[in-house]
Amino acid sequence: PLIRDFEVCRSAIIEMEYSHMTKSISHIGDFIEQTSKRNKGCVIQNVLSVSNSQGFIQQSEQFENRIVASDNTSNYKIVEKNDFAFNPARINVGSIARLTTFEKGIVSPMYICFRAKDNLYPEYLDYYFESKHFFTEIQKRLEGSVRQCLSFDGLCNIPLCVPTVKIQQRIGKRLSALVQEIKLEFDFLGLLQKQKRFLLYQMFI
């Protein structure tokens, strides 16, 4: 129940903080820039994917027992810490993320990559991508008859209300604190479950 309460609280704060987006006269494109630096010479070997539930993960974790990346990754795009990437064909199910767990990595050329400009706190944008408003705006901008995709221009046209950097940081830190609390509770629950299994095992030895 405690974990669920934290998650409900986090979702409620996100919706409250970003509920004024319909009044915005700015757009995401005013605050981000696209990146497309390639992995020339195949220097970076850390191949990443974007999961709709886990964010950036190593491709080997997402596709166990399968080699998905090409032997030649020179055309793969480089992502650095706090960069964002999304799969144009899967953003409608949440496949968009900010890189936080690695300093650098590479992603398939199909991904669209971008980063926040100096006047936008990356965490503020990151949490906006979890809001109902963002997913509503995505649906209006999907293109394609067979497989609907969101282009970078489509992303840039989405309204975004951006307060001062100080307020952005306050919102980001507030939500990050809740995320950390949820993680700690999940970790504690995992330890309790291990302890339970151990005790049950000892009972039947």
Task: Give the role of each language-model region.
Residues G29-V162:
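DNA target-recognition domains and sequence-specific DNA-contacting regions of bacterial/archaeal
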Residues T164-L189:
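Extended amphipathic alpha-helical segments enriched in small hydrophobics
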Residues P1-S24, D187-I205:
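Short amphipathic coiled-coil heptad-repeat segments
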Residues M16-E17, F31, Y128, R141, ...:
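Amphipathic alpha-helical segments that mediate coupling or scaffolding at interfaces
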Residues R4-G41, N157, C161, V165-K166:
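Non-catalytic DNA-recognition/assembly elements of restriction-modification systems
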Residues S11, Q59, F135, R147-Q148, ...:
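Glutamine-centric residue-chemistry signal
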